Amino acid sequence: MLIINKPAGIPVHPSMQHFEDSLSNGVKYYFDSIGLKRKIRPVNRLDRNTSGIVIFAKNAYIHDRLSSLMQANLFKKEYIAVCEGFFEEKEGTISAPIARKKNSIIERCVSPLGSSAITHYNVLKEFSVDGHDMSEVHVVLETGRTHQIRVHMAYIGHPIVGDTLYGTKSDFIDRQALHAYKVEFVHPISGKLLCINCNWSE
């Protein structure tokens, strides 16, 4: 496995807009530089403007086993987010299905026609900057839908600071304030529980 702390602003996969500067391109360059001929296999994915832990499998077996753990909800993912406003409920669970928004290939929304999505959260800290109330929130995903944390936080009235798709532009940060700081899973070969932490330095 290759474990990377992805900076914000870098997509995991190549696209028309980021054909040569994706994280996968960087991993290929690294593999080539050490003479490792491997297919690029990201296990988990993060949005371009989300920072944090991304894991790449070095062979098909590891990729398959880790993907199976994720599908069985045995691959625990935890995040830190800074959200708009102060939460009335300091901890809770958001259970609201998510679907693709009509007429959009990118945006998602809460919809009764969507797939099950469950997000657990607890507020770590509340603070104000220049009259703007914000909350630092610890988030644990039970499911892994596209944009799940961003959609759910906006749904309860606390969009992530800097999230221009589901909230508003921020004067304090030029990206969404969301960081994947911890993953926990059982190694498919050793059977040992791995707990990987990556602090948010911003």
Labelled PLM ranges:
Residues 8, 16, 59-60, 70-74, ...:
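A short beta-strand motif that forms part of the nucleic acid-binding face
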Residues 4, 94, 108, 135-137:
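Generic recognition of long tandem-repeat/solenoid scaffolds
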